[in-house]
UniProtKB/Swiss-Prot annotation:
It comes from Burkholderia mallei (strain ATCC 23344). Residues 6-235 form the ABC transporter domain. ATP binds at residues 40-47. This is Taurine import ATP-binding protein TauB. One of its GO terms (cellular component) is plasma membrane. Its EC number is 7.6.2.7. It catalyses: taurine(out) + ATP + H2O = taurine(in) + ADP + phosphate + H(+). Part of the ABC transporter complex TauABC involved in taurine import. Responsible for energy coupling to the transport system. Keywords: ATP-binding, Cell inner membrane, Cell membrane, Membrane, Nucleotide-binding, Translocase, Transport.
Amino acid sequence: MAKLCAQQVSVVYASRRGALTALENVSMSVGSGEIVVALGASGCGKSTLLSLLAGFQPPTSGRVSVDGAPVAGPGADRGVVFQDDALMPWLNVIENVAFGLRMQGVGRDARHARARDVLRLVKLAGFEQHRIDEISGGMRQRVGLARALAADPSFLLMDEPLGALDALTREHMQTLLLDVWRATGKGVFLITHSVEEAVLLATELLILSPRPGRIVARHSLDFARRYAHGEPMRSIKSDPRFTEIHLALVEQLMRETEEV
């Protein structure tokens, strides 16, 4: 089973006021078939942690690895989905999805075949030739997800991918993410500000403290796996335990913020 690990990582930035610690002694891992969600107040280092896992920046101390091999930069084994979809408006949907494969030297027929496969997976079959300005915000995020999936990475790293969507579209996208996870078995690391979203999607939930970001709690949750095993979403969200965990986490996050 593939595993992406951060071991005792810290990130310290230099500033005019002196050293600023964004993350302090954080250890966590994401394995195949897991959804690890990071939750915490703004500025707690969630995006910094994702940046380390993606290989966009090195830690000041500690180690990031995939299957024991050090992460020295971005790699095809880690696909990234951003809140801002970062699509290229001069390319149509299929060319956006296939762009990474094109940069890897994959031939046109092969990359388009792969792009069509992942577009079907994210329920965008039939939109291959549409321009980016012809599709909705939710569809744009699905294109971004398809682009990350096109290279068949072992891990998906998602930085608030649903944060800019309206409430109804966000609920549809949560279900889609779980459908994709169930179909692919990939390891997922996801950042969100939504407690309800975190409870629904996480198989492991990490609570980060306000700066410096430390993991102050870990929770194992089973709602995503219940959905993957066929339980209806309505049944899951109406479970009193879902509401109980949601409220307890809100209280915990409020306490963490008040203690700063």
